[in-house]
């Protein structure tokens, strides 16, 4: 009887617990190529285009001859809130959204060499979500904590470009192996 009550209580708590819904993985894309993004990043297991090498080089053996070009438009909402605390000047909302729109290009080309080999290249990027805060409050008698006293703005930015020349070999109808050389800038 106690076990049934415990299981019932655990089930109720599990159903009442909030789920996590992540709209972004931060700097890194949840998928590369419009089809992979539309399928929640499933491109690693189900290649659909010549950007397959971004997540699984072997996938290039399954996409055939193709050229894919695109641009991702990324518009995140970024801010932070400091709850009331013992440092009143450090309370409030801080918006680090000077730049609102990020355009990330992507390109992929694949050429089948017979029925079981593919040679291609995928070019893609990571980034966006940069954050730049205005000069923050100076709570200790005018000592600016957020910029090291330099007068510059505090923030972060990450931009990455990957070029991945790829070779893939189809072992049979359902299996392939592949290798990419990831050249990153």
Describe each region flagged by the PLM.
Residues 98-112, 155-176:
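Outer-membrane beta-barrel transmembrane strands
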Residues 77-100, 127-164, 185:
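Extracellular/periplasm-exposed beta-strand and loop segments of Gram-negative cell-envelope proteins
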């Amino acid at each position: 009887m106690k076990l049934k009550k415990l299981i019932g209580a655990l089930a109720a708590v599990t159903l009442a617990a909030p789920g996590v819904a992540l709209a972004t993985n931060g700097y890194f894309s949840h998928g590369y190529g419009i089809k992979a993004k539309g399928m929640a990043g499933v491109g690693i297991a189900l290649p659909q285009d010549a950007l397959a090498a971004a997540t699984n080089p072997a996938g290039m053996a399954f996409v055939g001859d193709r050229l894919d070009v695109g641009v991702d438009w990324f518009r995140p909402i970024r801010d932070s809130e400091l709850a009331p605390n013992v440092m009143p000047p450090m309370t409030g909302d801080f918006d680090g959204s000077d730049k609102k729109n990020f355009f990330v290009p992507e390109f992929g080309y694949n050429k089948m060499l017979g029925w079981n080999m593919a040679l291609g290249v995928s070019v893609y990027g990571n980034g966006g979500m940069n954050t730049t805060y205005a000069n923050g409050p100076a709570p200790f008698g005018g000592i600016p904590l957020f910029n090291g006293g330099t007068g510059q703005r505090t923030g972060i930015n990450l931009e990455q470009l990957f070029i991945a020349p790829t070779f893939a070999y189809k072992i049979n109808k359902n299996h392939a192996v592949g290798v990419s050389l990831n050249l990153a800038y």
